[in-house]
Amino acid sequence: MLTETVAGRTYDYSHNVGRGSATGMGFANPVALALDADGAVYVVNRGGESISNVPWDRTGVGARISKVSLGSQAGEEEYLSEFSRYGSAPGQLIWPAGVVVDAQGHVYVTDEWLNRVSVFDKEGNFLSCWSTLQSGDSEPNGAAGIAIDAHNTLYVTDGRSHKVRKFTTDGTCLGSWGRLGSGPGELDSPWGITVDDEGYVYVADFKNHRVQKYTSNGEFVAQIGSPGTKRASLSNPTDVAVDPDGDVYICTWNKNAWDRGRIQIFDPEGHFLTGLMGDAQQLSMWAEMTVAANTDYLKRRREVRSTEPEWTFAQPTAVAFDVANSRLLVADTQRSRIQIYNKLSNYLVPQMNL
């Protein structure tokens, strides 16, 4: 539904932004989101690989960082710029996975394949990069999610070594926690990560089908969600966000034909509130431009019985909360768009029956 009120909270679908594009105005498998102080959104495009039948011509398509303004309603979105591209040279990306922006506007991007963090300024100029590998690592760690706290400490999840590592912004490792397992505090392929206003760290524990909450030093605090088939369950959570009220938003993959992913919402105590499955009933402005430029495409769209299947999420991978505008941003990965929900306060439910 477009508007849902639960436990004093109202989530109201706003609009969506995006279309499939390997460059420029659009996205290519967006997998991470971050906002800067000016309200611009940095989108990590995982892209794809174009692999010919010869080993020396293996190239990637679409891997980059897009910078966009989402606007307050449909039609106000604006493509601002993009930077980086596929490759292993300094400033380039192969498997970009996470992004965060610090108070100075510096953009930090993790790369699972290269096991490093690349740093850019807000204009996209490359500044530096540093490895997430540490002495004693026996294999690549798969740097995935990244978050930053109020003290400028970076937290990076290692999907292959099942850890969370702490770094300074120049790459000095401050410590780590976690090991492979399913017990309290243990991890199995951690992915998305965030830090709340009180400094607690939340980790999307992908293969354990839960989110875990820690202190900034890695002490286990609580588990949010659990695996299963019930409405409140989690299935392969990929990312997590927390709003100023303490409500927790968990991005999940559900691998079945009728439910290809959703956002599960919990209150600060970990009680399930509701789930969002996507409501993009209208094409984005950019997608409308694509349709308008291709009359055959428009004809075929008018021939389908219903476009309802494309309204919902398809393997959403990232979620972020825009505090300044009190709204939730969801990277609808396989549909190459961002769906946006406003969190409303003092919403008055109409007193009528329809």
Model-based region annotation:
Residues 1-354:
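Eukaryotic scaffold repeat domains enriched in small/polar residues
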